[in-house]
């Protein structure tokens, strides 16, 4: 029958050519393993004594808090705050345009009753009446006069706990602060020739650009950062600002060395990385209440941005590694909401972003050293994804967030639809952030990480800015293009082809005729007949079969058979039949692998449902080992696979091994198996449902798990193509004879075809459900 193809794949010996092995290593996607290759990986260049390089800074970066500087007299630049930090009472600062504005600021200590004090203002002794009623706060008072020989008037004031004050020249005015900390505001004095006003500071001061006014206000309200209040901070002379600091520019090309044919170029670049996540959401067949998989998949993004006046076209590919698998099971009924597997990235995961742009730095990126980058962090927040149920309120997966932090950069190769090119792979480590994610209308909540359901949260892209430096060995002739030597990446072009093929395969489920399906399921499909629909099959038959079997060897089904073989040899001398459940578990272990999970049912908290579902997962192997004349789930699975291969336009020899392997593991996930003992039938499914009933009446009887374990050890195991509920429904509505019932229980293909040809809606509906489960 059709399932012969799986047995052939399991038992055939195969050869491996070295070229095939190398190609497979280059295209295999691994998960849950991250290898830090280091900055010199995959350069393809001879080992030489090169230096460690440098991470370059940019002269365009302006400090937020510049200082402290020693007391001095100077003309401060326009649009910069002078943040003054006096340590004692007295005159803090004074400034004048020598025409119509003389402004000075006086600091008064706490708890001072009204009194007259003498202050030196602009070189002249002045008597000023001051007061400060506050018990804790210091008081800054502005004293102003508009003529050289006029009297001073008081303005402000500013009641301050941190004892900080600030003044700025901006837009024809001199700005200061007033009010009371921590709720200060700014005020101004209109001044002619304001840009020529000289300021004399009598205390240490800092310089803050106007763009950071909010930071300045924060300091006025709450004080300087703790590091500024230690004795290790020594004020400098203001002339230190004029010292020229020679730094590498953010965007420049430097010739490091040059010979007649080759030269070393250092490329320093500002870089803007934009990327987005992509996800695959696969819904299971059936009534529409179950999802089989929600997973991340690689995402390409192309964009343009401006760098030093130059328009740069960039291309990124985002992929993830080290995913965490979660699941949700709402129950065993067909209308219970279930997500078999959904991926979440957390602190043990990594995000890879492959970046390439059309600038000169990437044109000859083959032999590279001294590769370094400084990147900002970015927070990625999940959105809301609604699970559209046929009836009832929809559950919603909502929330979740992670922050990405730069963890290294190496060379890589990107593959697009048309071209492959060498690029840089930026690796990001993750930390979880608020909010947590949950699934509404379920008990899933308070979990941290970013789920794959809606990772972009409606954003077109996430953005990371930073700087990049590398030294590249390039031809001295700028018109010559270095041949690209491809290096290995996690994602290659094959992944894109497989994604398109999966979508096409799932869409073809609607077009399969059931009579054709039963016919195909009865054919002994071998390797050649299964793949005969592919172009150039005859020419590539040997190599293609080898590739399929090589890939299949690593499948879950093949690994299960390996485990079965080992456990059979181990159990051969230790099987002892007895009345205890413990000995039943041991005798069953040769094929069920449940002895380590069910050791003492009488004291176990596990239910019968848990035990039967554990046993049922290995009944497929038992059925394969004792092939009967009835049709089984693998026959249907192989027939559907054959039909879809024949109709597919995307299938190719490269994608076939992955598709066959994936189909063997994922087609018809909800299977049920039965054993027959005279008039009694025991039926158990992988979803934990179990039935025991009589064939004559279809009346249920108590399910004896010990008897079930005994029977499956010695008796043939049969696929429950037509399960108990379908049989009972068929009998209640149409009435079936005892012989018809036995034939359906044995999955007799001839009887199944008769019911389908008669257009029996109950049988057709059951087969349609099985076909819809054949999804990738």
UniProtKB/Swiss-Prot annotation:
It comes from the Viruses. The keyword Glycosyltransferase does not apply. The record marks 231-232, 241-242, 247-248 as: Cleavage. Disulfide bonds join 203-216, 318-380. In group A rotaviruses, VP4 defines the P serotype. Changing residue 231 to H: Complete loss of trypsin activation of VP4, resulting in a blockage to viral entry. GO terms for cellular component: host cell endoplasmic reticulum-Golgi intermediate compartment; host cell plasma membrane; host cell rough endoplasmic reticulum; host cytoskeleton; membrane; viral outer capsid. Residues 65-224 are annotated as: Spike head. Changing residue 287 to D: About 50% loss of association with liposomes. Keywords: Capsid protein, Coiled coil, Disulfide bond, Hemagglutinin, Host cell membrane, Host cytoplasm, Host cytoskeleton, Host endoplasmic reticulum, Host membrane, Host-virus interaction, Membrane, Outer capsid protein, Viral attachment to host cell, Viral penetration into host cytoplasm, Viral penetration via permeabilization of host membrane, Virion, Virus entry into host cell. The record marks 101, 190 as: Binding to sialic acid. A motif (KID motif) lies at residues 644-646. Residues 484-511 form a coiled coil. A motif (YGL motif) lies at residues 448-450. Residues 389-409 are annotated as: Hydrophobic. Residues 510-776 are annotated as: Spike foot. A motif (DGE motif) lies at residues 308-310. This is Outer capsid protein VP4. GO terms for biological process: permeabilization of host organelle membrane involved in viral entry into host cell; virion attachment to host cell. Pfam families: Rota_VP4_MID (PF17477), VP4_haemagglut (PF00426), VP4_helical (PF17478). Belongs to the rotavirus VP4 family.
